[in-house]
A protein has these predicted regions:
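Secretory targeting and sorting signals
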Residues: 2-32
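Primary mode marks residue(s) on the alpha4-beta5-alpha5 output face of response regulator receiver
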Residues: 33-101, 105-237, 244-333
């Protein structure tokens, strides 16, 4: 009996000691990196910047040459007035409910969720007036000084809390390539842009976050912008547009669809397809704290902004997009 008591005492000490050690480790983790002391909360004060302190961006990376495709196509898909939200990620975690661990907002296909298939997307209703059944989605933006009260505002968990800000506008746009004509995207091509784990990854190779203010279109930042009164907060998410010609998806979700290199030239072995660009705008009162939904360990870093799409246009719809881009016209659908 004495030995059993001594063993029980030892176990209790180990458990308590382990808990203390865990607390020390967690405290050390929360005090490291560029967001000291924030643990898994965030964002940090340094995640915000006055847009006036952001230098103007350089001009376009490359002017469209004589062999390029200078057109543009705007697809009218509304601004998620249907309140299509979920915690799924069809591109990254197909078949896994709540696999995103944060909330996504959608335009386009109204049936899109983790369980969607090519066939279900092809049959789904859409918010796009021209009949595009593609799904376009991104993590929601929240006001953290106001509690979320609706079910879709409280379902994500994992530290994602606050009132979801509705998009004041959503622009779905396709652009061409500055040095080449584009070829059609294949049906059900999956694509993603940005790095949802940018805070912990450290390296910035996949970071594509572009935050800004509507009154300063020449300034963009990877931090949350403080905008002048009357301006909208903007997010611009440009997707890779060089397809390997074979696959609609890939392990890691990037190798089949890559970004152009310098001057807009696609990497060897890839072909230029229409470049998708999403531009989101929000009404944010001056000084209101905002945070993009994220994995808990990413601390709502603005650098983690990202978006995904699945192309469900018909071959005819995509052909019209390609023709508009390659002939240098500005079209709407």
């Amino acid at each position: 009996m004495g030995n059993e008591r001594r063993l029980l005492t030892l176990v209790i000490c180990l458990v308590l000691g382990g808990g203390g050690l865990l607390a020390v480790l967690l405290g050390a983790s929360g005090a490291s990196g560029p967001h000291p002391g924030h643990g898994t909360a965030g964002p940090a004060p340094t995640d915000y910047v006055d847009i006036g302190d952001v230098p103007p961006s350089p001009g376009p990376a490359a002017a469209t040459g004589p062999d390029g495709s200078a057109g543009s196509v705007t697809v009218e898909c509304g601004r998620n007035g249907e309140e299509h939200y979920n915690e799924d990620n069809l591109v990254v975690s197909p078949g896994v409910r709540a696999g995103a661990h944060h909330t996504h907002a959608y335009v386009g296909n109204l049936s899109a969720d983790a369980m969607s298939t090519d066939a279900s997307l092809d049959a789904g209703a859409t918010s796009c007036t021209g009949g595009d059944r593609s799904t376009y989605y991104w993590p929601v933006l929240r006001r953290t000084d106001r509690p979320g009260t609706r079910p879709f505002e409280t379902s994500a968990g994992h530290g994602n809390a606050g009132e979801i800000l509705p998009e004041a506008s959503v622009r779905v746009e396709f652009r061409g390539n500055p040095v080449s004509k584009v070829v059609p995207m294949p049906r059900f091509l999956r694509g993603m842009t940005g790095d949802a784990v940018a805070f912990t990854a450290g390296a910035g190779a996949d970071v594509r976050a572009r935050w800004g203010c509507s009154g300063s279109p020449d300034r963009s930042t990877t931090r949350y912008p403080r905008c002048p009164a009357g301006d909208l907060v903007t997010r611009t998410l440009a997707f890779p547009s060089c397809w390997n010609g074979l696959d609609t998806a890939s392990a890691g979700h990037r190798s089949h669809l890559r970004f152009p290199e310098g001057g807009g030239v696609c990497p060897q072995g890839t072909f230029p397809v229409p470049e998708l660009r999403l531009t989101l705008a929000y009404e944010v009162p001056a000084g209101a704290p905002i945070a993009v939904d994220s994995f808990p360990e990413q601390r709502h870093s603005p650098r983690t902004d990202h978006a995904m799409f699945v192309n469900a246009m018909t071959d005819g719809q995509m052909a019209r997009v390609v023709d508009c881009l390659n002939t240098g016209r500005d079209c709407r659908t």
